[in-house]
Amino acid sequence: MKNKFNYKPLLTALCLGLAALISAPAFADNPFQLDGNAISNEVGHPAGDDWDVVNTTGGNSEGRTGLVIDRPEPTQSIFTGGGAKDQMDITAWKWRTGTPPSKDDLTHAYAAAYVQDNNDFILVFGMDRYDTSGDAQLGFWFLKDEVQPVTGGTFSGKHQDGDVLVLVNFSNGGSVPTINVFQWQGGQVNAVGTGGAVKCTNGYIPAGQNFCGITNAIAVKAPWTYENKDVGLTDMFPPG
């Protein structure tokens, strides 16, 4: 991983079958395929990397997490304490062992960063979940500090000014996300951008928008082994 990508993604919420989101001014030479699948050479694909490339060789990204695997197990690490954690400093976050609802159980997560020639900084990220039925929310914290769960049910690290939170809500089984972006500043989170219900079109950010999201409306091939609640291990992502 190149040093230019110095944010550390921490997953704080939920997601759905396959999703990707980008944050940057709209431009024609998108470095990443925002097309609702994870394969770079699908018929009619736009230019740029896709997750099959980014999660193996890194593609043209400046930095990447790779494929973060969290297989569904009877006992997992989950957030606890009740209520939203996003308004709290990391020193107040708590975790415990437990089993999340199937629709909230993430099996993989992935993120990458790109820097354009004009210094636009672009973040793309996504995840898949064990059960794709039901509403869900995707949440990514991009943190400057090193943050990890520690023995006793707390976390190491703390928020720093400039930490970024992106929330993406998918409801009613829809494929059009509602996107909200926040930044930690002065001890609290502050809204810095709301994309509303913005779907990526033709693999790109729609003109005049800074954010977009997309999920697969139909079953698509998975470039890694995916475990689904209904069918077990499979090489296909179900719709949604």
Question: Where are the predicted features?
Answer:
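Sec-dependent, cleavable N-terminal signal peptides
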Residues: M1-A28
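Surface-exposed extracytoplasmic segments
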Residues: A28-G240
